[in-house]
Amino acid sequence: MSAVTVNDDGLVLRLYIQPKASRDSIVGLHGDEVKVAITAPPVDGQANSHLVKFLGKQFRVAKSQVVIEKGELGRHKQIKIINPQQIPPEIAALIN
């Protein structure tokens, strides 16, 4: 499975998360996943909620349209973006 998959209702992203980074950013490929750096620490779900908020802004969707499908408690996550309004250039470059 590739890092970015296009479905009928949106995108599925396989992510590797780097918490407690100096700034929020989509770094690029990390193996067969997309590396995303976020500033929030991995404590009490702070990193997950921060990730959902960050991806919502990047894809211009509501937070409810960003769904963590797998990896709630780990660094490796599978995220579904429902009907993205915009696709960041870092992700667009990975879509086949």
Curated annotation (Swiss-Prot):
SMART domains per record: DUF167
Entry-linked SUPFAM superfamilies: YggU-like
InterPro entries: DUF167, YggU-like_sf
Pfam family, one: DUF167
CC terms in the record's Gene Ontology section: cytoplasm
PANTHER family listed in its UniProt record: UPF0235 PROTEIN C15ORF40
Similarity annotation: Belongs to the UPF0235 family.
NCBIfam families attached to this UniProt entry: DUF167 family protein (TIGR00251), PRK05090.1 (NF003466)
Stored HAMAP family: UPF0235 (MF_00634)
Protein name: UPF0235 protein YggU
Native organism taxonomy: Bacteria, Pseudomonadati, Pseudomonadota, Gammaproteobacteria, Enterobacterales
Gene that this sequence comes from: yggU
